[in-house]
């Protein structure tokens, strides 16, 4: 399958043949597992001190005194038990808890291939919430000169020429302050995802693009399901460079 390649001003440059990965079957179940696997891989096992709440001289006086048989200090205050001040926890976190979603290597690659193919389907991309009115084609491939852009203003000009600016505005307007404790824990804002830029190798465009609202930049070799299907939802609006398409040929 061939698609158009566009210059930085939005004009057509020519055609490029897409890798076979863009024809992969859509498997939302595999995509979800792969993304959850990537998310849970960041979790850290948690436990507590094995003697937490046990370090006390309190003891029970036994039955026959008309009071609960909990361990008590010399002053008569309850200790050791979960309902007592300074007592142990009833069900503390265990390091043995299984936190990670395991996935086979071939399944993970199949999920990535499926997510890449979904990013070329206008119905799936639109259903995810992206604004694609006026976008010349999906998948959207741009001239490799894009990777040499060093200014955010220049990148924004390319996005405007390719009609991607509407999706940037959607992401910018969608930034909201979260409710609850998240505000106190370094994740105050909910930030929608907009365009994913896939480049061939590390380049100037990486730093120039990532300051735009909702935009992420990744190299073709580092691309995974969590980038192209964030939140387990496939169909992210993606801008590919010519060199990124060539790298996909070698990866799949």
From Swiss-Prot:
Keyword Iron: no
Matches recorded under Pfam families: Ribosomal_L4
Keywords: Ribonucleoprotein, Ribosomal protein, RNA-binding, rRNA-binding
A GO BP entry: translation
Transmembrane segments: none
PROSITE patterns per record: RIBOSOMAL_L1E
InterPro entries (alphabetical): Ribosomal_uL4, Ribosomal_uL4_dom_sf, Ribosomal_uL4_euk/arc_CS, Ribosomal_uL4_euk/arch, Ribosomall_uL4-arc
Cellular component aspect of the GO annotation: ribonucleoprotein complex; ribosome
GO MF term set: rRNA binding; structural constituent of ribosome
Role of this protein: One of the primary rRNA binding proteins, this protein initially binds near the 5'-end of the 23S rRNA. It is important during the early stages of 50S assembly. It makes multiple contacts with different domains of the 23S rRNA in the assembled 50S subunit and ribosome.
Quaternary assembly: Part of the 50S ribosomal subunit.
Family: Belongs to the universal ribosomal protein uL4 family.
Protein name: Large ribosomal subunit protein uL4
Protein species of origin: Methanococcus maripaludis (strain C6 / ATCC BAA-1332)
